[in-house]
C-alpha cells in the first residue's frame, strides 16, 4: 500500500506543470514585508527593490491563488510605486523620492473602510485661505481605507472623492491626516440614481466568495444567519445547513474544520470578513465532500485581554423557553494568543405530527412530542507565531449533553381491508444523552526553505446513549410495552500533510491524508419484540492527492487528482461479516477553467466525488416506532459515486449558476417490507439517477435598502422500479427567496425575509411546497460594544413538513408542524474584543462528520 501511495505522489510530482500562485492574508504589514514574502514563495522571478523606501506603505489584502505578477500588482495597489518585469527579474521602486508621506484613513457612511477612493493633496503653505494651491500629489485608498502620499509642504489640503459620495476635505499640518468619513450623495442622471458600491460576489475556485465585512451582512446576527443569506445555501428551522443540489457542506472557520454546529451560533456576523461557497471542491478535500463553505474572520492584533458575553432567550409558540449563555475570553501577548470559549445551550424542539402508513395494515397516527436538550461546551485554543510565515497551535473541545428528554403522546388507528380494528394510545419516554465527547487538534503551518508545510493532526472520541420506554394501550387490541437501551461509541485518529513548492513556472501542491476510525454499538430490548444487536466497524482510509493551477492571461485553469484506499471491516457479535466488509481503491479527478470577459467572470468545473454511508446508516439495530413500523440501518450499503459539471457566471451583485450531476449507486431513504405485518424505514442503493439545477441571485445596493433576490430550479430523473417503486417522481421544483434588508445607520439595521417553494420530488418522496416569513432588527450602543437583537421566525406558522413517500408496495404520509414559530432576543457585550483565529484545518474531517 505504501509503495502504491509513494508511486502515485511521485507521479504527481513528475508530470505536473503548475502555474505558480500566491495565497496569503496580509494584515496591515509594510509593503516591503509583503514583497519579501512573495519573493520567498517563488523561484521563477528575482524581485529587486529597496527595502527602506517601501516601509511607509501599509498593505492589507487577501490574495487567493494569484500569479506572482498579479499578486505584486495587488499589494502595490495605487501607491506611488512602479513595477517592471524583465528577463525573469521584477524591479520595484518608489516613484516619489521623499522622506515625508501624508497618511490617513477614509471611512464610508457606515464607518467601514472605503477602498479605491481618490485622494488629492494640495499645497497650503502659501496661506491661500481658499485652499486653491497647486495639487502636489494624489493616490487611492487600499482595502483598509488607508492612503499614503509623498509630500513636500508642511501644510496641505486633503480632498477625498468617490462616486456616490460628497467630496470631503480638510487642512492638515504635518504627516497625519487622521480619519475622514464620507457622506452619501445620490446622483440623478437621466432619471437613474447612481451610487458607488463594492462588488458583492467574486469568483473563487470551484464557487464564489461573498464580502461580509463591508456589507450589512455583518449585522445580521450569528454565522448561521449569515449563511442563510448566501446564494444556494439553505438553513432550515432546526439550524441544519445544506447547499442546493450538493447536500450538507464541510464548513471551515479560518481554515479549521468546524465539528460542532454550535460554533456557528457562537461566531457573530460582525467577526466575519468573507464567506466562500465551493460547490466543486478540489483534490485536497476528502472525496466524500460535495460542497465546502469557508468562513474567514477578521483579526485584531491588539495585545491584552478581551471579553465577549452573549446571552440569548427564545420563546416557542407552544409555551416553551430555550436559550444560551456564552463567555469568550482571549489573551494576546507578543507572538502568543490563548483563547477560551465556554457555553451552555438549551435546545427546545417539538412537533405536531399526523401521519399514515399503508401496508398489510393501514395506520393513521396523531403524535405530539417535545425534546429538551441541555449542552455544555468548553473550547480552549492556543496559537504561537514563530515568525511571519510559521506558526503552531493546538485546540481542545469538550462537549456533554447533560439533559436529553423526549416525551411523546399520541394515538393511532389500525385498519385492514377498509375495516377499523381498533385504536392504540401511545406514550413514549426517551432519554438521549451525548458525550462526554473529546476532540484535540494540533497544527503547524510554515516553511522549510521555499517549501510550504501545512500539517494537521486530530483525535476524536464520541459517545451516545439512549434509553426509551414505549407504552401502548388499547381496548380492542392487546396492550404492549417496549423498553430498549442502545449505545454508540466512536474513536478517530487522523493526520494530514500538505506540501507546496515552487517548481519550474509554477507551484506544486501535493500531500497525503490518513484516518483510522473505530465505532461500535449495541441495542437491547427486554421484551425481545425486536432482536438484540451488536456491531463494530473498523475502517482505515489512506489518500494521496496533487493539484495544480495555471494562469494564461485572462484564462485560469486548475486540475487535481485524489487517490483513496479504504478498507472497512464489519463485525456482528464479534464475528466478521464478509458480505458487509468492504475494500475500495478509487481515483477522484477535478478540473476547473475560468476566464474574465469584461466585468463578467465565468467558470466551468467538473469533479468526481463519493458519498460513503454514515455509521448511523450502517448500523444493524432497529428502532421501534409502533407495532407496525420500525426504523433501522443497512450494513449492505455501498458508497455513492457522483460526477458533477457546474457553470458559474459572476458580475458585481449578480450571480448565475447551473449544473448537472450523475449518481451511481445513490443511497436512498425507502420503506420496505420487514415481515408480513411490519414495514421497515431504512436505506438502500439504487442503480443510478440524475439531477439538473440552476440558480440566479441578485443583491443590489439601493441606499438604505439592500435586498437579495434568488430563484432556484431543481429536477431529478429517477427510476425506482428495481426497488418496487413505480410512481413517477421527476417533476421540477422552484424556490423563491426575497430578503428585504435595510440599514438605517451604522448602529441600526434589520430585515424581513420571505421564502416560498413549489412541490418537489426528492428520492422516493413527493414534498409539498410551503411559504415562510421571518424578521429581525438589531441596534447597537457605545461604539458597538453593546448590541440588542430581536428576531421572529416563521411568523405565519406556515413552515410545515408535508410529504408522501413511496416504497415497495407501501405508501406513507406525513403532515407535521415542527414548532418553528418563535421569538428570540439576544444581548451582546464586548470589552476590547477581537475575533479568534485558530489556524489549523484539522485532519480526517469527513470521518468526523460521519461520526
Regions found by a protein language model. Name each.
Residues 90-95, 175-183, 191, 223-226, ...:
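N-terminal periplasmic accessory domains that precede
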Residues 125-146:
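Short, acidic Ser/Thr/Gly-rich low-complexity loop/linker segments typical of extracellular
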Residues 148-150, 223, 229, 256-282, ...:
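Short acidic/polar hinge/loop motifs at secondary-structure boundaries
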Residues 429-431, 435, 536-539, 579-582, ...:
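Outer-membrane beta-barrel signature, preferentially recognizing the C-terminal barrel domain
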Residues 492-496, 541-543, 638, 644, ...:
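Outer membrane beta-barrel strand-and-loop segments of large Gram-negative receptors
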Amino acid at each position: 500500500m505504501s509503495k502504491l501511495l509513494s508511486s502515485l505522489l511521485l507521479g504527481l510530482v513528475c508530470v505536473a506543470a503548475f502555474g505558480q500562485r500566491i495565497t496569503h492574508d496580509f494584515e496591515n504589514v509594510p509593503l516591503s514585508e509583503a514583497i519579501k514574502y512573495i519573493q520567498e514563495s517563488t523561484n521563477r522571478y528575482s524581485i529587486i527593490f529597496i527595502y527602506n523606501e517601501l516601509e511607509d506603505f501599509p498593505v492589507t489584502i487577501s490574495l487567493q491563488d494569484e500569479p506572482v505578477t498579479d499578486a505584486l500588482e495587488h499589494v502595490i495597489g495605487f501607491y506611488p510605486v512602479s513595477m517592471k518585469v524583465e528577463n525573469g527579474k521584477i524591479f520595484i521602486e518608489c516613484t516619489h523620492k521623499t522622506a515625508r508621506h501624508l497618511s490617513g484613513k477614509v471611512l464610508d457612511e457606515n464607518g467601514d473602510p472605503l477602498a479605491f477612493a481618490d485622494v488629492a493633496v494640495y499645497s497650503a503653505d502659501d496661506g491661500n485661505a481658499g485652499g486653491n494651491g497647486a495639487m502636489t500629489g494624489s493616490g487611492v485608498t487600499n482595502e483598509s481605507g488607508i492612503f499614503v502620499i509623498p509630500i513636500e509642504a508642511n501644510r496641505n489640503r486633503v480632498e477625498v472623492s468617490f462616486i456616490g459620495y460628497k467630496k470631503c476635505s480638510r487642512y492638515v499640518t504635518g504627516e497625519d491626516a487622521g480619519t475622514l468619513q464620507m457622506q452619501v450623495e445620490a446622483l440623478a442622471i437621466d432619471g437613474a440614481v447612481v451610487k458607488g458600491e463594492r462588488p458583492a460576489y467574486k469568483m473563487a475556485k470551484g464557487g464564489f466568495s461573498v464580502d461580509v465585512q463591508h456589507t450589512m451582512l455583518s449585522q445580521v446576527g450569528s454565522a448561521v444567519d449569515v449563511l442563510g443569506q448566501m446564494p444556494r445555501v439553505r438553513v432550515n428551522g432546526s439550524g441544519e445547513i445544506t447547499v442546493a443540489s450538493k447536500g450538507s457542506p464541510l464548513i471551515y472557520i479560518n481554515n479549521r474544520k468546524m465539528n460542532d454546529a454550535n460554533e456557528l451560533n457562537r461566531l457573530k456576523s460582525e467577526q466575519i470578513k468573507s464567506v466562500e461557497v465551493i460547490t466543486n471542491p478540489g483534490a485536497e478535500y476528502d472525496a466524500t465532500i460535495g460542497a465546502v463553505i469557508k468562513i474567514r474572520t477578521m483579526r485584531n492584533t491588539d495585545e491584552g485581554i478581551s471579553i465577549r458575553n452573549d446571552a440569548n432567550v427564545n420563546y416557542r409558540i407552544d409555551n416553551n423557553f430555550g436559550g444560551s449563555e456564552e463567555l469568550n475570553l482571549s489573551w494576546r501577548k507578543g507572538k502568543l494568543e490563548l483563547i477560551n470559549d465556554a457555553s451552555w445551550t438549551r435546545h427546545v424542539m417539538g412537533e405536531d405530527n399526523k401521519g399514515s402508513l399503508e401496508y398489510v395494515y393501514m395506520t393513521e397516527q396523531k403524535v405530539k412530542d417535545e425534546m429538551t436538550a441541555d449542552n455544555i461546551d468548553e473550547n480552549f485554543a492556543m496559537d504561537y507565531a514563530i515568525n511571519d510565515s510559521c506558526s503552531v497551535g493546538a485546540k481542545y473541545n469538550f462537549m456533554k449533553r447533560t439533559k436529553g428528554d423526549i416525551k411523546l403522546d399520541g394515538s393511532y388507528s389500525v385498519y385492514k381491508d377498509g375495516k377499523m380494528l381498533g385504536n392504540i394510545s401511545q406514550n413514549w419516554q426517551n432519554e438521549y444523552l451525548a458525550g462526554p465527547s473529546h476532540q484535540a487538534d494540533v497544527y503547524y503551518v510554515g516553511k522549510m526553505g521555499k517549501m510550504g508545510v501545512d500539517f494537521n493532526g486530530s483525535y476524536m472520541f464520541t459517545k451516545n446513549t439512549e434509553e426509551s420506554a414505549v407504552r401502548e394501550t388499547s381496548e380492542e387490541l392487546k396492550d404492549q410495552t417496549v423498553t430498549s437501551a442502545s449505545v454508540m461509541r466512536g474513536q478517530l485518529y487522523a493526520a494530514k500533510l500538505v506540501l507546496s513548492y515552487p517548481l519550474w513556472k509554477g507551484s506544486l501542491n501535493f500531500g497525503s491524508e490518513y484516518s483510522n476510525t473505530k465505532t461500535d454499538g449495541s441495542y437491547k430490548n427486554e421484551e425481545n419484540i425486536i432482536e438484540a444487536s451488536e456491531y463494530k466497524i473498523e475502517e482505515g482510509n489512506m489518500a494521496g492527492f496533487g493539484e495544480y493551477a495555471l494562469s494564461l492571461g485572462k484564462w485560469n485553469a486548475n486540475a487535481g487528482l485524489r487517490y483513496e484506499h479504504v478498507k472497512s471491516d464489519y463485525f456482528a457479535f464479534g464475528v466478521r461479516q464478509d458480505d458487509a466488509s468492504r475494500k475500495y481503491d478509487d481515483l477522484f479527478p477535478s478540473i476547473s477553467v475560468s476566464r474574465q470577459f469584461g466585468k463578467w467572470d465565468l467558470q466551468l468545473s467538473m469533479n468526481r466525488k463519493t458519498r460513503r454511508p454514515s455509521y448511523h446508516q450502517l448500523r444493524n439495530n432497529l428502532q421501534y416506532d409502533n407495532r407496525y413500523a420500525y426504523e433501522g440501518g443497512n450494513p449492505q450499503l455501498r458508497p455513492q459515486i457522483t460526477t458533477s459539471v457546474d457553470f458559474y457566471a459572476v458580475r458585481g451583485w449578480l450571480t448565475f449558476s447551473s449544473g448537472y450531476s450523475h449518481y451511481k449507486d445513490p443511497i436512498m431513504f425507502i420503506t420496505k417490507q420487514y415481515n408480513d405485518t411490519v414495514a421497515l424505514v431504512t436505506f438502500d442503493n439504487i442503480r443510478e439517477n440524475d439531477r439538473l439545477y440552476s440558480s440566479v441571485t441578485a443583491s443590489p445596493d439601493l441606499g438604505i435598502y439592500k435586498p437579495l433576490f434568488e430563484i432556484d430550479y431543481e429536477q431529478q430523473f429517477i427510476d425506482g422500479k428495481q426497488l418496487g417503486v413505480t410512481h413517477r417522481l421527476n417533476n421540477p421544483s422552484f424556490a423563491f427567496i426575497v430578503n428585504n434588508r435595510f440599514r438605517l445607520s451604522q448602529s441600526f439595521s434589520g430585515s424581513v425575509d420571505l421564502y416560498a417553494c413549489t412541490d418537489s420530488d426528492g428520492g422516493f418522496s413527493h414534498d409539498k411546497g410551503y411559504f415562510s416569513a421571518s424578521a429581525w432588527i438589531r441596534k447597537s450602543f457605545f461604539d458597538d460594544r453593546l448590541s440588542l437583537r430581536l428576531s421572529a421566525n416563521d411568523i405565519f406558522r406556515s413552515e410545515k413538513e408535508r410529504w408522501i413517500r413511496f416504497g415497495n408496495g407501501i405508501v406513507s404520509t406525513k403532515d407535521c408542524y415542527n414548532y418553528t414559530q418563535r421569538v428570540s432576543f439576544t444581548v451582546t457585550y464586548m470589552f476590547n474584543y477581537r475575533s479568534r483565529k485558530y489556524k489549523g484545518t484539522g485532519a480526517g474531517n469527513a470521518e468526523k462528520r460521519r461520526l
